[in-house]
Structures are given as C-alpha cells and as structure tokens.
Amino acid sequence: MHLIRPFTGLRPATGRAAEVIAPPYDVLSTDEARTRAEGKPWSFLHISKPEIDLPAGTDPYAAQVYAKAAENLGLMMREGILTRDPARCYYVYRLIMGGHTQTGLVAAASLAEYEANRIRKHEHTQTDKENDRVRQIDALNAQTGPVMVAYPDAREVDDILDRCSAGAPDADATADGGVRHSLWVVRDAEIQARLTRAFDAMPALYIADGHHRSAAASRVAAARRAANPRHTGEENYNYFLVVIFPHHQMQILDYNRVVSGLNGMDVGTFLARVRENFTAEKSPKPVKPAKPAEFGLYLAGQWYRLAIRRELIPASDPVARLDVKLLSDHLLGPVLGINDLRRDKRIDYVGGIRGMTELERRVNSGEMTAAFALYPTRMEDLMAVAEAGNVMPTKSTWFEPKLADGLVSHVLD
C-alpha cells in the first residue's frame, strides 16, 4: 500500500471555480455563511454549511442538515457545476496571499499509514466535532474538506510540482480576502508514479490543520470496512483527502490571547507578579514579538515587551519550550489562574490575521482586560512535537492562507 495515491477528483466544471469555492466549514458561523452565500446558488457553503438553506434556528447537527448537504451536492452534480475526472489524477494546488506563495499536491492519503502514525498528528480531537464530520462524510459519501499536511524537504517533489504548475491552471479563482487558488491536473502516468515513489520514500508526513477531518475519515473507514465482507483495502474509503505542502513554504501566523480580569489583582500587583518570571519594559508602540520567548502585553492602554527568564525555558522538551506553553505555565496559570485553556471563559483567542489593532480593540472596548501577543509557532516546532508523539497546547497554530472547500473533493465509491 502506498502512502498516497491519485484519485478521481470531483471539482468545479471549467470556468466555475470562482462560483463554487468557499472558506473551510469551521471558520464561518452559520450567519456569516448565510451572508456569504447570498446570491451564490453554487457556493460550496450550501454543502459545507447546509443549515443556511433551512429555517433560521435549525440545529446545525440535525439529521435534516446532513440530508440537505447531500441534496445540494447531488444538485450541483446533476447541473454539471461539479464534475468528476474520469481517470485518477494528482492535482497541484497553489495558494497566493499577498507576497506569500505555497504550492502543494492534492492526493488521497492512506488511512492505514495515518493509523500507524506515519502521518503524524499534533492535536487532540473533540468527539462532538468528530461526530459531525463523520455524519457529513457518510451523508455525502465524499470527503469535501481537505486536510492540510506538510512534507519534509524533498527537492525532487518541489521540482515536479513547479514543472506541473508552469502552464495555465485548470482552475483559477480569487476568493474573498484576495487569496488566489489555482489548480493543475496531473494526468501523466509517469509523473504520477514518480510522485507516488517520492512520497513512499518519506519516513513521515505531518498534519498541520484538519485533525477532526482526518479522525472522522478514519472512523468512517473502520465502519465501512467492518460492513464490507469483500473489503480489500483498495476501496476509496481507505484513503483521505489531503493537500501536502513542503514544510518550509507553510505560513503559521501568531495566535494571540486576550483575558478578562486580573484574578482579583490591580494593575500594579499583576505586573509585579508577571515580573517574577518575565522582564517587562514599557513600549511606546504595539509589541509584535520578533523572536521566540518574547511576548507583547497590552494592559490599561499601555504596551509592554515581556521576555521570559532564560532559565525557565527547557532545553529538550518540545512541548514545554513552545511560547504558548511558556505563557501558560508561567503566567496564565500561576498568575491569572487560567489553567483550562479550552473551557475557561476568561480567555479568548485572536488569530494573527486580525492584526495588533484587534488586540487593542478587545481591551479598549472593556470586553477584555489584557492582551498577549505571541511569536508564531514554527513548523519545525510542530514537527518536533509530532515526532515525539506529543500534542500541542490548544490554539497553538493559525495557518494562513486557508485551503478552499469545493476545489477538489474525494468521492468514496
């Protein structure tokens, strides 16, 4: 069994990509999705967020929602908006956001290798979110949300992808926000074989974004395997939809924190506690950390540059030395009493795409008391955590640009 293989992708008909592609299902609320899809009958949001086509207030996890997704997918196929390639292909997918470009391979990845941890994870998943994706995949009989994966340095693969994307793309669309999504179909059997061999030679791949989608695909495969007396391992359900990028091209933005209250302390007392483990210097302008172990703090209209004391940074533990963990272990927990980062209502998270002004706005509005700006987690840190078999703290990574839903889907029959 190969690590990856080509597949017969379901994708927008020629010239229809701009009408179809949509942000990932989990970055928009129902109301946001309804607004985005207004006047766009072929937006993939009608499949990924199908509750927008049902009465307001419909439970997004009701059976009728998944049925509506299947109905909408069937309609788009019957109307020729989505068409399926007749033969197995790989696809080269390029994302351009501002001055950033990354080029990856769309493929079907082996769930057996995922379950054997050759496709490595770095996050825990939540059962309710997994359940939602399982029901979506089963209802559609397809995986429509690609998992973002990284491969370690492989010049041969980089060169093949560059050559395959040298001509005009088969699909090209600029989405809301200005991100350009381009797709090239790789039909040549010899090039496909070279790509398959190159990935077979890799010791591991690393999931960057999409842990719930991959876990759900694994669960669907297990159920179908158990129900299929003629199971061979070659069925499409034994693979999951991925886009694999070279790790050095992937862009992780800062994932910042805002907190409500100072755990009963006034500003002076709080800063004194902070200075037990950090240096803290006032700054006349916003502090966007320029290196690891440096943090920005915005409090009472004032920015501070924080630096954790070097002796507190573990030399070898790949999780404990992460900036998100250092902040939690030496400030959020012991000073503010925020120990459950997933459930504590006093903390919220702000993706770096929103900028420093959003941190100031959340505090200046009185909604939050303090904001912490962090240096982005590096891909090398993520890979080290995955190699050690550990998991990242919650809200450690914010990848940009995001993959589009609807550009290529993986049908399970």
Where in the sequence are the language-model features?
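Surface-exposed, charge/polar-rich loops and edge strands
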Residues: 1-413
